[in-house]
């Protein structure tokens, strides 16, 4: 539940009234929030049609109130991450996928800005290099998994191998897989086996203490166009745009179908996908932060305790310090 009693911990009441411009009672009535993230979770075996799912938020929560809520959630994430790091027996892997310009980089920056860098690592996966092509498609992703006690973020991931490679199957030929030396041989059985490999990989991680959550930022084609134009028009954003972005944009529908099948085949109870409306960046960031916060809380993390003998030693050490001359 989101009310003044919670955000007062972050922002003084005087500043809240100034920013939001409504009374305390009106705020509670207007902005009471239940956990919204469940509606964006893809149930195992569920059919997915992206064109029927929202790309924007049209609810009552206003941007400034949402930002205040996010600050509260980030404090909770930070506390949970401290416990995760201290306990050192579990890890969290967060996967981000999206069409170009959906806001993956900025979402990662905003959601994880409050965590201790020692306990968090981010990997951005680009086109595989020669060494990576010489191994199976999961090899480079396995090498980038978070250690116990850490949060790992994969900006793009092993799913590129059933997304980009599905739209451009000629890329599969670079993997030198026996029996697949021609695009015409890459059939439905090939993709089915690849989905199964991904599910087995993620289940293996789960079985060994790594919780996996997968985020898809669902951007509309119209909003992508506007963001591309912003990158072209703003000199400080020119570096973000490449001509190849328009080539991939022409394959929009092919990518939508590839994503839909990936969600249907790989969203499981233990490793779910979340399809988050991304046209409004502030809302997408809030939902992602809540998903991360909820997931960490579900792990029921605690700071490690000490044995009786260790506690006795602490008492001795305390006495020694206090008696120092």
Language-model-detected regions and their locations in the chain:
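Conserved nucleotide-sensing/catalytic segment adjacent to the nucleotide-binding pocket
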Residues: 62-64, 120-125, 130-186
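Conserved nucleotide-binding/hydrolysis micro-motifs of P-loop NTPases
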Residues: 101, 128-131, 157-161, 169, ...
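Glycine-rich phosphate-binding P-loop
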Residues: 96-111
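Charged, amphipathic alpha-helical linker segments immediately N-terminal to NTP-binding catalytic cores
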Residues: 27-74
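NTP-dependent small-molecule kinase module
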Residues: 251, 255-260, 264-325
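A glycine- and Lys/Arg-enriched "phosphate-lid" helix/loop adjacent to the NTP-binding pocket
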Residues: 166-195, 205-257, 304-311
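Pre-Walker A (Motif I) flank of P-loop NTPase domains
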Residues: 88-93, 149, 271-272
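Pre-Walker A adenine-sensing motif
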Residues: 78-85
